[in-house]
């Protein structure tokens, strides 16, 4: 099972491009775990809207009650993943379409 884990914080400017690069992979992950670290912009609602339009993946979306910072938020997100193989990515990454396949 392949999981992708994303930690977000105020990433409204880039998050859609990152999510598109995940759903366009030649090998689709079994799940995508996204944990938002108390964004004060529209990141969370943008992700919710994206998920509604792209339901072919098992999405797991969470929002922290308090800001943990990037390192603790990634640890938190990884703990929620169920995959044997876990890819981590930042909210402003854009993946090559064959990233999962090549890895």
Regions found by a protein language model. Give the residues of each.
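Nucleotide-sugar donor-binding/catalytic module of glycosyltransferases
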Residues: 1-103
């Amino acid at each position: 099972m392949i999981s992708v884990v994303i930690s977000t914080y105020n990433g409204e400017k880039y998050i859609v491009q990152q999510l598109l690069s995940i759903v366009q992979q030649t090998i689709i992950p079994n799940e995508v775990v996204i944990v938002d670290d108390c964004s004060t912009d529209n990141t969370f609602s943008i992700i919710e809207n994206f998920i509604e339009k792209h339901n072919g993946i098992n999405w797991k979306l969470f929002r922290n009650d308090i800001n943990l910072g990037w390192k603790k938020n990634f640890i938190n997100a990884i703990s929620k993943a169920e995959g044997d193989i876990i890819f981590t990515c930042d909210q402003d990454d854009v993946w090559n379409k064959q990233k999962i396949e090549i890895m």
